[in-house]
Amino acid sequence: MDKAVLDDVIRRLLEGKGGKQVQLSESEIRQLCVHARQIFLSQPILLELRAPMRVCGDIHGQYQDLLRLFEYGGYPPAANYLFLGDYVDRGKQSLETICLLLAYKIRYPDKIFLLRGNHEEAKINRIYGFYDECKRRFNVRLWKIFTDCFNCLPVSALIDDKILCMHGGLSPELESLDQIKEIQRPTEIPDSGLLCDLLWSDPDSSIEGWAESDRGVSCTFGPDVVAEFLDKNDLDLVCRGHQVVEDGYEFFAKRRLVTIFSAPNYGGEFDNAGALLSVDDSLVCSFEILKPADRASGSSSKMNFKKPPKMGKI
């Protein structure tokens, strides 16, 4: 995809502030999906990334809040970004949201990284809004092209060999990170098993071990599971999205797992803040908060993680 064309697409998308709809052509969106899909498949399913990195949780079609996140954190390529999935559904502007992220991915493939969420899956976004938005603004064919692209997204990322990121959480099947590398793409999300859990599971402070999930899919896991997994794999932190949390971020398991959610006033039904996690090159984590009412930002908690020796470029 020509850089000038791509830059023009990005420029038009960035003009969509204040809730203004940006209508790209069907051909442009198709090109975004096809080119991004090729890049996703050319990069590992378990991304190995280097700090500094800004980490964002669920966006869910809240395009104005995505633009606000970039205003706070810096527009690519000024900063490196990792998104934890759930770009579409529920919000009013799923198309603008996913198109801007795909355009940035193509333009700056080593500066912005997109993981798969449980909503980047046909049988889910068929129901929760993305299908209807595609059909209303374009056609069902285009929705199917997005499905082909989503089926190639990576599912996990490792920052400096110490911070493991995914959309959902851990799995009773996951013992070694090498198992993630063995997942073949393109793939749909199965109803059970490792890939399902990575995108669907949740922490639960009231249990030990594993339990069934109220979602009716996947499972929940206790703080003991987090500690055991991190110790066994010489990791410091699990970073995930998937759940609305009041302050935009929430720690679990003695600060060894953090949930990041980046859609403030989620769906217009919650009074939650959104958060942007910044990991500096010493693995100090700090949070930028998008408040629900006035959307004012403010930095919050900081914590240190031991940085491993540099082993050359990965």
UniProtKB/Swiss-Prot annotation:
Q: Which GO terms describe its cellular component?
A: cytoplasm; nucleus
Map out region (Disordered) in residue numbers.
Answer: 295-314
Q: Where does Mn(2+) 1 bind?
A: D58, H60, D86
Report keywords, A-Z. Hydrolase, Manganese, Metal-binding, Protein phosphatase, Stress response
Q: What is its EC number?
A: 3.1.3.16
Q: Do you know which InterPro entries this protein is assigned to?
A: Calcineurin-like_PHP_ApaH, Metallo-depent_PP-like, PP1_catalytic_subunit, Ser/Thr-sp_prot-phosphatase, STPPase_N
The name on file for this protein is Serine/threonine-protein phosphatase PP1
What switches on expression, per the entry, is described as:
By stress.
The residues annotated as the active site are H119 (proton donor)
Which cofactor(s) are needed, names only?
A: Mn(2+)
Q: Which reaction does it catalyse?
A: O-phospho-L-seryl-[protein] + H2O = L-seryl-[protein] + phosphate; O-phospho-L-threonyl-[protein] + H2O = L-threonyl-[protein] + phosphate
Q: Which family does it belong to?
A: Belongs to the PPP phosphatase family. PP-1 subfamily.
Q: Compositionally biased, Basic residues: which spans?
A: 304-314
